[in-house]
Amino acid sequence: WIHEQYNNWVMTKNKLDLIFKSYDIRGVYGDSIDQDIAYKIGKAFAEFVPDDTIIVGHDGRVSNIEMLDAFTSGIKSINKEIIYVGLVPTDTVYSLSGLLKKPGAIITASHNPKNYNGLKLCNAGAIPIGENSGLMDIKKLADRNVEIRIEKFKINDKHLGNEYYEHLKNLVSPESISQKLNFGIDGGNGVFGAVFDTLNNIYKFNVKSIYLEVDGNFPNHPADPSDESNLTDLKNLVIDND
């Protein structure tokens, strides 16, 4: 039994060393990051922040529901509450963290390939948690043998989208935009597609769009705009509608 526990600890430590980066947590799902690791990070994050309630959202990756179940189970293991905001961009979680003065977590691997997943964490007030501001403390807390009990997260219908959109309108009111702006948008099958219609109903831009359907398999091209080859379809969209 002791040998098994030691092996489990070594395995967890090796995975944590691989996935904890300077500003976030990222790894190949099912390999360096999995439900057990997500549970431990959820528990560690809940212990690290002093607040009783944590905002949680996620993007459209195919492994996100499993990650959500495990991460939220870790949070709830120490009896903390969750404000679930659903399928949203990272900006939404950070904005709500600032508005509500609550810590937040978004399950995402940003522009990494589809087989990756991870987490971005922030303190209350949308203060990012990075290598020199608490992320390594969370890693240490996660590096323990704990009883893992993962339960299906019960998704409720209480989202905070309205608060986010009202915040955007306070920053830039629709009335302040005197000229109709023309945009070409490639959603890259990422989570932006989940909020685009609401944003466009507010600001009423002239938009030509492609790939707004949220699909964690990224069937049209990788969700990495830093690679210029992924911008080919967007360039053609703009040229064709000039």
Residue ranges and their predicted role:
Residues 54-117, 199-242:
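N-terminal small/polar loop signature for handling phosphorylated ligands or for N-terminal nucleophile
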Residues 23, 58, 108, 185-188:
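Active-site flanking residues adjacent to catalytic metal/cofactor-binding acidic residues
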Residues 9-73, 77-79, 154-181:
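An N-terminal, well-structured beta->alpha segment
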